Amino acid sequence: RIFVATFSSNTSRLQQIFTAAERHGRKVALVGRSMLNVFNAANNLGYIQKKPDTLIEISQVDNYPPEQVVIISTGSQGEPMSALTRIAFSNHREIEIQPGDTVIISATPIPGNEKPIYKVINELYRRGAKVYYSALADVHVSGHASQEEIKLVHALVRPKFFIPAHGETRMLYQHA
């Protein structure tokens, strides 16, 4: 089985995972309340393109051979109540890590989250999973626009006013 932990709000990453899973004949299950909520909204609005039989319930995972399953999970930052953390520590009521599972954490730790995510990664290793994360593999692409992408948006939208509102002081100055 392949687990992919990502931000639930990253719908383009969800689409990438569905596309890759279908290309390789795998079913996809979702785990984590926010993952289910965001997926349902994106799917209902037509932002997720998938075959009708690709998505399965997490309770159906054991009905398929491990090489036919991808599980998309919340918890890429090691949040204590996230699905991946609960799965890693055998506190999830529907699924647990099995030796040989592959876990991809597709986000770089946000500064300050290193300790909790490495605690989860250590536990995944203890349970026999193969773990891929930003320090070992090229599995993270920023969800933030690059400087050139921001310039393009400004050129397209041509706002009358613009106020940078997110980031550290140095970032706000650079953005302005």
Report each predicted region and the residues it spans:
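Acidic/His-rich, metal-assisted hydrolase cores and their charged scaffolds
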Residues: R1-A176
